[in-house]
Every structure is written in C-alpha cells, then in structure tokens.
C-alpha cells in the first residue's frame, strides 16, 4: 500500500458542490446557507476582546492567516454610521459567484458579523452585507470583497 504525504485538495469537490447548490437551491438560499456557515466558523475561533478598531483588525488578520483566507482592513465611516470591511485574497471556488470568483463572500458576511458584534461597544441589531453597487468593482482585484456593517434598519 502506498501512502502519500500530500494534503488532500478539495478544490474540485468544492467547485462541483458550488454548482450543485446554486442549481438546486438557488442563489438566495445558497447565500443564507453560507452566511450560517460563516457564523459557525466564527463561533469555532474568536478574536479576543479589543478596545480599538486597529487592535481588532490585527486580531482578525491573525485568525484569517491561520486558515489562509486572506486579510482584512476595517474602516469606520462616521457619516454613514457604518464600518467598511475590505477583505482581500478570498479563496476562490473556480469562477463561481457574482461577481465571478466570489462564491464564498457570504461566508465572510456571517464570519465578520459574529466576530465584530462580539466586541465591546457593539450594540444594536447589526447586519453585514455586500454592497456591489457602492464600489467600482473594476477598480479592485478579483479576490477582494467589500462589505459594510450597518444597523439592520439602515441596511434595508
């Protein structure tokens, strides 16, 4: 019996799974499912309590590095009473997702939503969403996802 020391590669499986989920469940159900997966991931490993956005950004980047999921930049938008979350180097599942290559973006919505609302000073009913129309997607790299965290009433 031959034993290989290589780690398994799940990219082909994930790409086929993404197509099946999209075809059978539809985009809205897929996004809801992936948001819940993100919340579940965030519950498995959480950042320590941080007193500043800068500290939180450092801690979130340390967690993302553990799973090779890119990195994040957090910006408070005082006038909009929102937080801009720019995630770079999101793993791709082939070209799946809208825009292409961003199939896992809803996972980030759940992940950041749970991570950030667990911090001191986070109060209210927050939601993390992608706002594709708010950014010029041609001006950012393909593996960059821009999210906004707002109170639920301001997001709808």
Swiss-Prot record:
InterPro entries: BcsD_bac (IPR022798), Cellsynth_D_sf (IPR038470)
Any one Pfam family match given in the protein's UniProt record, by short name: Cellsynth_D
Keywords assigned by UniProt, alphabetized: Cellulose biosynthesis
UniProt keyword rRNA-binding present: no
Pathway connected to this protein: Glycan metabolism; bacterial cellulose biosynthesis
Coiled coil: none
Extent of the signal sequence: none
One of the GO BP terms on file: cellulose biosynthetic process
Keyword flag Magnesium: no
Annotated function: May have a major role in the perfection of crystallization, involved either in the pore structure itself or in the organization of the pores within the linear array of terminal synthesizing complexes (TCs).
Protein's name in the database: Cellulose synthase operon protein D
Organism: Komagataeibacter sucrofermentans (strain ATCC 700178 / DSM 15973 / CECT 7291 / JCM 9730 / LMG 18788 / BPR 2001)
